[in-house]
Amino acid sequence: MSDNDKPKLGMRAPLGIKRTVETSKVKQSFSHGRSNTVIVETKRRRVINKPGSGDAATAAETAKKQAEPVENTPNKDTAVTQTATKNETVATPAAAPAPAPAAAPKPVAAEATAQETSKAAPAAAQPVAEKEAAAPASAEAAKSAAIKVTDRGAKKTTEKNGANASGNRPSGNRSQDNRGRQGGRGSQNKNQTRSGGQPRQPRTLAHRDLASRQELQARLLREAEESRLQALEEARRREDRLKQEADLEEQRRIEEKRRLEAEAKVEAEKQAALKEKEKAEAKARAKAEKEAKAAQAKTAGAAEGEEKTRRPAKAAAPKAREERSESPRSPAPRRFTPVSPPRREAPRPAMRDRKGEDRRQSGKLTVTKALSGDEGGARARSLAALRRAREKDKRANQNRAQQVRQIRDVVVPEAITVQELANRMAERGADLVKALFKMGVAVTLTQTIDQDTAELLVTEFGHNIKRVSESDVEIDSSSDVDPEETLKSRPPVVTIMGHVDHGKTSLLDALRGSDVVRGEAGGITQHIGAYQVESPSGEKITLLDTPGHEAFSEMRARGANVTDIVIIVVAADDGLRPQTVEAIDHARAADVPIIIAINKMDKPEANPQRIREALLQYNVQVEAMGGDVQDVEISAAKKTGLDELIEKILLQAEMLELKANPDRAAEGTVVEAKLDRGRGPVATILVRRGTLKVGDIFVVGEFSGRVRAMTDAQGKNQKEAGPSMPVEVLGLSGVPQAGDTLTVVESEARAREVAAYRAEIALRKRTTAQPASLESMFSALKDKQAVEYPLLIKADTQGSVEAIAGALNKISNEDIRVRILHQGVGGITESDVSLAAASGAPIIGFHVRPNSKARDIARRDGVALKFYDVIYDLIDEIKAAMAGKLGPEYFETVVGKAEIREVFSAGKHGRAAGLLVLEGYIRQKLRARVLRNDVIIYNGSIASLRRFKDDVPEVRAGLECGITLEGSTDIKAGDIVETFEVEERARTL
């Protein structure tokens, strides 16, 4: 029974991946004449051709192979093997990368192919252990599957052959039944058998079985390859997962290690601190025990010495001591020994009778024991006595420690509070107050004492004093002189001075090639400007332009102090004016050379010779008049004579040998300072020596700062400024005074210290009262009687503020004086308006304006805001306002004088006076006063005027008349009557 004929247990065929098996019958003939019909499995042969090859070639090759006669039976295995190898090569080119051997002795070709596949698989495996294990496993599985299929096919073939041998069925029917399936193959086999006389070997069946096995083997190899690739992919994924897990584990382990290290460190610190604490406690405890033992030993030694002096020396003392040791219960004299329990012998086994003993007397000192000298037992010292001894030693040690006092060096300034001095001495403040009270000075801890009193205290407490002065903080630049080898030539600083409208700024414009006059309000200079120009020869000259108005005398003085050469501009058509003379005085006070520039020579009325002669009145002698002062005739408008002027400036600078050290910390002078709304405080600095750089820390006046930016006269940013170079500096903490010195320091702390000291000195000067004198008392009384005119001044620059304040103070007199509540640089703010509203003062704004909020507050509170651009207008209006506050002036003019000759009654009018007019005239309703012995006894007016009995309006000199006075009858003969008129005039200052 074949596999297909076996009975099925189930109703349905089992599911599987096997295809339906097709069978056919083949007649097998043997050499001895017998034949056998064999049922074989029929499979269609599939030939896989290479691309480009046709089906005809394949069919011809197949027919040729089938037509070859089978010569020998022993070569069947070899042929089958070769065919299998060739078909395998064609069918599965991807499964066998290595070429198969030409002949294999084994009957199954799948085994060789599986072995080759298994050999190739490990070569492609990865070096990972899992991948190496997966590849051989897949190869072994493929090999075993191929062997099983081969064995199963061989077994089926054997069973079929046996069935055919026992059946004896005719082969023709089988061949005819399978003719439709076999096609021409059955006929061909049949014809071959008939024509040949010999039985033909079933090569076609072997080829079909071999093809089916090859297909199965190829499929299994493909599945094995897919399994191997899948296993490799899974191994790679597993390796990546394990690697990630290992990284995470490593990171967790590192974090855990760090945490444990931190905890261990904290624990170690705690343990160390605990050990230190325990060590300190043990040390203190050991020290206390050592002191206690020392005290006990000292007390015991003293007690033993006392006992030896009291007790007589006996030869039998050792014997008595032995007896006392044998009987410790006997009474013994009192001994001062350290606290320790008395030694006792070991308890005896037998208890003796104690009825006769007096235990209450044991260990007590009696007269009998003391006289007999019995020292049978040592008396222990009480705890109270030991405690008292310890306290005594402790007090002695404390007194000894107090006697050792640390001597300190105490720095004492000119003024210091008691508490601060106590802190520096490390003493209690109460002790210093007690010491001062003993000296007769009653102060508290917060009061200030002078340096001499502080020195007495420091000396009394045993310390050393170190006297310092507050001025030590100040920077002393006078002693800082640069060595001669470090000096280098620098440009000259030239100041242009002169009267108003004489052409100073026009000359500067001609030298600079700019137009500064057009930017000034009213065409006059009201600020001091600093510029630097370059001569045609390439040498630089620094120019300072000063105002010519009389209010700016302080600016002119500052300009003369920081300059090297002064150019005094005199208009040839106007001559010498007051400010011209003042400029000459400033230049002489500063001891700088003068160059006279006679300007406006282009006008027809110019007379330079008259200018030279007028200068002789002020001891200015030009070279043309035999002197040493240079003079130049120029015209700033026509730009004539400028080259000669520059030449003389450079000649004068060469004679002066101007030098400075550029390689040092910078020092400069504030030429002008202002508060810019966008940039903050800005100062124009003229560097005198050193180099000022961006980032330098400096002190200027009462303020400190750091150079944030520097710009020159053209508005270009500069990184550094050398000697004689004017720059605008940003970065100040406040607006300094014009003329203050700028000094670069090493640190911000030093800058703040110096600035704080200068601010304190300035505040002290403002608040310190002047010593009282008779003159100052009368002056203060006069000031109180005078009317005050309060106001606030805000200007764009510090120099303008000073000029306005000085000019307003000059117009004050004994009747009214200006009281400046506040003066500052910058715009008008809300705080300025609030201060003015509280005092009822107007606010003067010079080149500044208020912000919108300040304007609203001023409108609400009724504060007057006055704005000016020209200082002339400001001074004139303030004068008029001050005069208006005083009111008009009244002037008396005596128009008549008469003498009373007779007094008579006038009825209801009282008393009338008969007069003789001596001077002038007397009119009715004129104001009159009565003088008696040159003392005014009446001041009023004339009620009525009569001549004889008629009322007259006027009586002139030489005539007689009668008058009555309003509200007065105290008149006598001989009194003088004066009549006068009062004229009201507007007050002027």
UniProtKB/Swiss-Prot annotation:
CDD domains: IF2_eIF5B, IF2_mtIF2_II, mtIF2_IVc. Pfam families: EF-G_D2, GTP_EFTU, IF-2, IF2_assoc, IF2_N. This is Translation initiation factor IF-2. The gene is infB. Residues 498-505 are annotated as: G1. NCBIfam families: IF-2, small_GTP. Belongs to the TRAFAC class translation factor GTPase superfamily. Classic translation factor GTPase family. IF-2 subfamily. GTP binds at residues 498-505, 545-549, 599-602. GO terms for cellular component: cytosol. Residues 149-159, 234-293, 342-361 have a biased composition (Basic and acidic residues). Residues 599-602 are annotated as: G4. Residues 105-146, 294-303 have a biased composition (Low complexity). Residues 545-548 are annotated as: G3. Keywords: Cytoplasm, GTP-binding, Initiation factor, Nucleotide-binding, Protein biosynthesis.
